[in-house]
Amino acid sequence: MIKRQKDRKFELVSKFKPAGDQQQAINKLTAGFEKGYKEQILEGATGTGKTFTMANIIAKLNKPTLVITHNKTLVGQLYGEFKGFFPNNAVEYFVSYYDYYQPEAYVPQSDTYIEKDSAINDEIDQLRHATTSALMERNDVIVVASVSCIYGLGDPKEYARSVLMIHEGQEYERNTLLRDLVNLQYDRNDIDFQRGRFRVRGDVVEIFPAGNSNHAYRVEFFGDEIDRIVEIDSLTGEVIGERESISLFPATHFMTNDEQLRRALKAISKEMKVQVKKFEGEGKLLEAERIKQRTTYDMEMMGEVGYTNGIENYSRHMEGRKVGEPPYTLLDFFPDDFLILIDESHATMPEIRAMYNGDRNRKKTLIDYGFRLPSALDNRPLKLAEFEKHVNQILYVSATPGDYELERTDHKVEQIIRPTGLLDPKIEVRPIEGQIDDLVGEINKRIDRNERVFVTTLTKKMAEDLTDYLKDLGIKVRYLHSDIKTLERMQILRDLRLGKFDVLIGINLLREGIDVPEVSLVAILDADKEGFLRAYRPLVQTMGRAARNANGEVIMYADTITDSMKAAIEATQRRRKLQEEFNKEHGIVPKTIIKPVHDVISITKPSEDSKKEKTDSFADLNFDELTAKQKKTMIKNLQEQMKEAAKKLDFEEAANLRDAIMELQSSSRRPKTRKGKALNGKR
């Protein structure tokens, strides 16, 4: 079995030193964990450099670390930042490897069975394998993950037992190596050399590990002895360097042996008979026949080829778990003494809590109607209580920690001072009567100063009406809403920053990627209408959009001051006062953040001859006017751009490209119903 190296240290590389009150936060939180505190909170205002603080804590504690956040875009951003902070350590990326996923489901009302359909992203699968192999080999590992890390991943002990370690001079027959590779789920293919495959050329075996992106190994034999091991470029075959020894990890996380498979098939057969008998006793003959046919077919497939579509539904039997026992997840691959950082904890923890119930409700219907055995319920994400049992030490990080975190621990550290000296925005409450005329006056002031404005409304109709009204007044305005596609959204934000329009109206401007330094005014209409979008945390998050500009201001239009408004205003004013005192003491003058405006991702690929080729923006396209060939070409170009972005570690751009590809693929499958450009949500 492979042994983990334990003597590696985290090495933080940065031209910056902790500034503002980052150092006190780093010291307090590090000391707390060293004292044995299990749970702590970092309440850091927007723009105070919470990620840099997290990096310093990781370096000081020197423990394997799992960073979890609630969506893939944020995972990509954090991965890129940590990769930059720790270039000499293992920083890994772990998200769901599905580009497209339609879960198996049944709708009783219409008697509709929806079969599971999915498309796996090969690059993300490689990154997942790189994650688990790094966790097995070394202790200086940071894994940045989405909540998919609480889903089943296979038994880490069986995975570790399966690792094949070979070294130069070892007595090892070539054919024995080939059999061992097949047992590790590697495929032999002498022509198409890809991850998880090997090829044979006389006494030379070339192996492309599942966790590598472009490097493979060449193992050269002399008789029954390994004569030489070299690392090669998988595409060109160029030798990169010689290796004394290598560890070959399985090509799948779900490793099983023949004995386990025999036991599993026996247990599945037994459960099937019990379920058939139950249905027959209830007079449900259709369900009884259905579960018998489906399960028998699956067992025959597993017996013949070791696999069947939906094999994960039998994971409890394959792994020998008891009824209700939690599945193995990424968390089980970590050593006992590890650190968890929950980024944006106010959003991430509710998502971790919600995963189990959503999964269970869908599967319960499949079981009740004879599509799956009851054991399918144990192929699931962790329950919140099970997640908590995995926690050794955990840090919740948020500008607005949730009730869950605040109830779990009293150990809270604030980070209020921004290294840039920027203050929390000024806040003013004005009456609703005449709010639009007042807003127009404030917008014109910002336009005169070449600044931008965010306006947040409560309803889609109000946002649309306000957009039309401002346009009639000659104000350059756009409306951001949920119907707008990924790349069009990026184009809108870029155009706002470039000054192509001055006002952006939306219902929920809390989504990631909305930080625009040019925005000096955030106007919140109907601020006193209590609800999700006007609760304390969303209000604080919305106010934070004006915290990137030295002239940042928030105007809340309301006739009464609700408890949520009062709490949000008081919290912001308290922080602003502390920031002003700090700036005065240290002679700091706040300056607006200077952030370069990146080009929106192009749809057409520039030619080698001319880099000036015109490109279309995603916003200007009507998918229904494109031919199937045009869509295919566009998808291919976007896929190339996605791979290039991933190579440059720009995972935010890669994730946006992936979303755009999925939108194009989806438009290719659905019937044509749209007319005209999908701009501003109009049909």
UniProtKB/Swiss-Prot annotation:
Domain UVR: 632-667
Pfam family, one: UVR
Every Helicase C-terminal domain range: 435-601
A Gene Ontology molecular function term of the record: ATP binding
Alphabetized PROSITE patterns for the sequence: HELICASE_ATP_BIND_1 (PS51192), HELICASE_CTER (PS51194), UVR (PS50151)
Region (Disordered): 662-683
Limits of the Helicase ATP-binding domain: 31-414
GO cellular component, as recorded: cytoplasm; excinuclease repair complex
Main subcellular location of this protein, as a coarse class: cytoplasm
Annotated localization: Cytoplasm
Residue spans of biased composition, Basic residues class: 669-683
CDD domains per UniProt: DEXHc_UvrB, SF2_C_UvrB
GO biological process: nucleotide-excision repair; SOS response
PANTHER family recorded: UVRABC SYSTEM PROTEIN B
Oligomer status and interactors: Forms a heterotetramer with UvrA during the search for lesions. Interacts with UvrC in an incision complex.
Swiss-Prot/TrEMBL domain comment: The beta-hairpin motif is involved in DNA binding.
Described purpose of this protein according to its UniProt entry: The UvrABC repair system catalyzes the recognition and processing of DNA lesions. A damage recognition complex composed of 2 UvrA and 2 UvrB subunits scans DNA for abnormalities. Upon binding of the UvrA(2)B(2) complex to a putative damaged site, the DNA wraps around one UvrB monomer. DNA wrap is dependent on ATP binding by UvrB and probably causes local melting of the DNA helix, facilitating insertion of UvrB beta-hairpin between the DNA strands. Then UvrB probes one DNA strand for the presence of a lesion.
Protein family per UniProt: Belongs to the UvrB family.
Protein name: UvrABC system protein B
Organism: Lactobacillus acidophilus (strain ATCC 700396 / NCK56 / N2 / NCFM)
